[in-house]
């Protein structure tokens, strides 16, 4: 199974257990070069042929590429590839089951709407773990869902995007802003949350500008009628 980069959506080349993230070579180099501690993370190389996680590890901000790997499909006597690891959680398992069920009834339910509903359920669950009251939960979920809506990537329901959108909602609706607790609740590293949340925030700003321009143009057309 092909895994995709959590930051850009391209095919992933490595998996970082410390960040619970799949990354392509380019994003891995940028992200792990941004901080001395990040650079020390060990990342597992993904076999370019069978797409499984190998037993080859790399560390440091810059990598020689391609790394030396022996694909299990090339050698029947010895396999460098482990069984495919999946970064999962009870929330993501629930998301996958719900989306799969939606595919079986596409004539009645829009799969995108199902994904949004599942994401909202995950946000509510995380708010509960943070101890937020109903009003704050509604506000956080609204902002987080809006952040996901402006994200056009087809893999926007991945845990890293959910965590980033959730942090966006928490930042913009509460005075309680503890990224460490959000990290603990979501299972996504603070560094990954910050990196993706900043992209969501920029996308949100651009979308708000477009909405404002469209609204102003609409009022102008009405005035001319």
Curated annotation (Swiss-Prot):
Q: Which UniProt keywords apply?
A: Metal-binding, Nucleus, Repressor, Transcription, Transcription regulation, Zinc, Zinc-finger
Q: Where are the zinc fingers (B box-type)?
A: 5-46
Q: Which GO terms describe its biological process?
A: blue light signaling pathway; negative regulation of DNA-templated transcription; photomorphogenesis; red or far-red light signaling pathway; regulation of DNA-templated transcription; regulation of flower development
Primary location recorded for the protein, binned into one broad class: nucleus
Q: Where in the cell is it found?
A: Nucleus
- Family annotation (CDD domains): Bbox1_BBX-like
InterPro entries membership: CONSTANS-like_Bbox1, Znf_B-box
Q: Which GO terms describe its molecular function?
A: DNA-binding transcription factor activity; zinc ion binding
One GO cellular-component annotation of the UniProt record comes to: nucleus
Can the keyword Zinc-finger be found in this entry's annotation? yes
So which domain of life are we looking at?
A: Eukaryota
Q: Which PANTHER family match?
A: B-BOX ZINC FINGER PROTEIN 32 (PTHR31717:SF115), ZINC FINGER PROTEIN CONSTANS-LIKE 10 (PTHR31717)
Give the record's subunit note: Interacts with BBX21.
Record function comment: Repressor of light-mediated regulation of seedling development. Functions by suppressing the activities of positive cofactors like BBX21 and HY5 involved in modulating light-regulated gene expression and growth.
The protein, known as: B-box zinc finger protein 32
Source organism (scientific name) = Arabidopsis thaliana (Mouse-ear cress)
């Amino acid at each position: 199974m092909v895994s995709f980069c959590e930051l850009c959506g391209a095919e992933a080349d490595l998996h970082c257990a410390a960040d619970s993230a799949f990354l392509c070579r380019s994003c891995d180099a940028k992200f792990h070069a941004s901080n001395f501690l990040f650079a020390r993370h060990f990342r597992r190389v993904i076999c370019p042929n069978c797409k499984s996680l190998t037993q080859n590890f790399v560390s440091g901000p810059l990598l020689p590429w391609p790394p030396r790997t022996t694909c299990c499909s090339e050698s029947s006597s010895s396999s460098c590839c482990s069984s495919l690891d999946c970064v999962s959680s009870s929330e993501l398992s629930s998301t996958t089951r719900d989306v799969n069920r939606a595919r079986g009834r596409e004539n009645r339910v829009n799969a995108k709407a199902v994904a949004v509903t599942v994401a909202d359920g995950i946000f509510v669950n995380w708010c509960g773990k943070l101890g937020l009251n109903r009003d704050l939960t509604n506000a956080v979920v609204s902002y987080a869902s809006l952040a996901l809506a402006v994200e056009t990537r087809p893999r926007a329901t991945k845990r890293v995007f959910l965590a980033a959108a959730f942090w966006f909602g928490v930042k913009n609706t509460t005075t309680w802003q503890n990224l460490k607790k959000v990290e603990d609740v979501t299972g996504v590293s603070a560094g990954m949350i910050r990196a993706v949340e900043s992209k969501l925030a920029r996308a949100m700003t651009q979308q708000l500008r477009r909405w404002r321009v469209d609204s102003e143009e609409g009022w102008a057309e009405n005035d001319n009628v």
